[in-house]
Regions:
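Short hydrophobic/aromatic patch on the recognition helix
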Residues: 39-50
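Hydrophobic alpha-helical connector segments
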Residues: 59, 70-97, 145-148, 152-155
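Amphipathic alpha-helical segments used for helix-helix packing
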Residues: 92-118, 164-168
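Amphipathic alpha-helical packing segments from all-alpha helical-bundle domains
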Residues: 111-142, 149-154
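C-terminal peripheral helix-coil segments that are non-catalytic and often amphipathic
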Residues: 133, 137, 161-228
Length: 228
């Protein structure tokens, strides 16, 4: 195995272990000392991969976003794709909520992470385009007049709200089984388009959303060219 591959493998192990420690802590923060101890590495070795703890956190979030993107790229049926969109949050509610909290904190206070945030947003925009294709395709298959924008927003709202419920030990005392709640929420989202019969109008929202994403991507590329 080459030294480059060894370095890459070690970095992946660092990210996976740091993610697990974050989830176990539940507070959105860990110490590099505890991470180094868990990995049986010198603390200085961590700095060969990440210049700061904030950079480590953001790299974990980028890795998570890449995993979501790869799941959304599965090409089977649009209904299965829509179901996966919701389940991504409902199956790992703690991770979805915690990583969003960490990202918001980094965006508000961290310094020197503009390039990495640009990388994160590019991956997210690519995933957004895939989600738009899935939701638009499902709406068409259901002959629905619901707009892509409204359907996406509802899916995210239900996913985020459902994740909050599933992550709450207090509300879980009253909500019963987690698996039946997940099934109910997914089924609600699959049934929603049928409540909006088609009026034979084109879904301009889909085109607008794609154009907006493309414009943001072009602006990001131009800003990178200017800064370099």
């Amino acid at each position: 195995m080459s030294r480059q591959q060894q370095f890459k493998n070690r970095e992946e192990k660092i990210l996976a272990t740091a993610e697990q420690l974050l989830l176990e802590a539940g507070s959105g923060d860990i110490t590099l000392d505890s991470l180094a101890d868990q990995l049986d590495l010198a603390k200085g070795t961590l700095y060969k991969h990440f210049s700061s703890k904030d950079e480590l956190y953001l790299r974990i979030i980028i890795r998570y976003e890449e995993q979501l993107f790869n799941i959304n790229k599965i090409d089977d049926s649009v209904s299965a794709g829509v179901s996966r969109m919701i389940l991504q949050q409902l199956m790992s509610p703690q991770k979805a909520l915690l990583f969003n909290q960490i990202e918001e904190r980094l965006a508000a206070s961290a310094q020197g992470l503009n390039r990495m945030f640009g990388e994160l947003y590019e991956i997210r925009r690519a995933r957004m385009k895939r989600l738009i294709d899935l939701t638009s395709g499902y709406l068409q298959s259901q002959n629905s007049g619901l707009s892509t924008r409204d359907y996406l927003s509802t899916i995210w709202a239900i996913g985020q709200g459902g994740a909050s419920l599933l992550n709450s030990s207090f509300y879980q005392r009253y909500l019963g089984r987690r698996d039946t709640l997940r099934v109910a929420l997914v089924q609600q989202m699959l049934d929603l388009p049928k409540q909006y019969p088609s009026v034979d109008e084109e879904d301009d929202d889909m085109v607008d959303l794609v154009n907006q994403i493309d414009s943001e991507s072009e602006a990001h590329i131009q800003s990178q060219d200017t800064s370099s």
